[in-house]
Curated annotation (Swiss-Prot):
Keyword Lyase tagged: yes
The name this protein goes by in its record: Putative pterin-4-alpha-carbinolamine dehydratase
Entry's EC annotation: 4.2.1.96
Record flagged with keyword Lyase: yes
């Protein structure tokens, strides 16, 4: 696991649609038709996060899911956060 510099983070985010840097986290908001779809999405994220032993912070607001990624042990964003973000995006392609 490698902690990324701000430049490295921005370079990665430029390749990823919808993700942004917010302080010490990368964040993306996902919109769904309703609450059930939002929960189903998180049910798909869970096994991926578990397999990586890396878990996002999430908030659900009816049909909106906000996902935040950071590596607390590293004190910032690492390659693991970027990898998980890409895998989460793949769920919707």
């Amino acid at each position: 696991m490698k902690k990324l510099t701000e430049k490295e983070i921005r370079e990665e985010l430029n390749k990823m649609k919808g993700w942004s840097l917010k302080g010490n986290v990368i964040e993306k908001t996902f919109l769904f038709h309703d609450f059930k779809e939002a929960v189903n999405f998180l049910n798909k994220v869970q096994p991926i996060a578990d397999s990586m032993n890396h878990h996002p912070d999430v908030c659900i607001y009816y049909n909106k899911v906000i996902v935040q990624l950071t590596t607390h042990d590293a004190g910032g964003i690492t390659d693991l956060d970027v990898e998980l973000a890409k895998k989460i995006d793949e769920l919707l392609t």
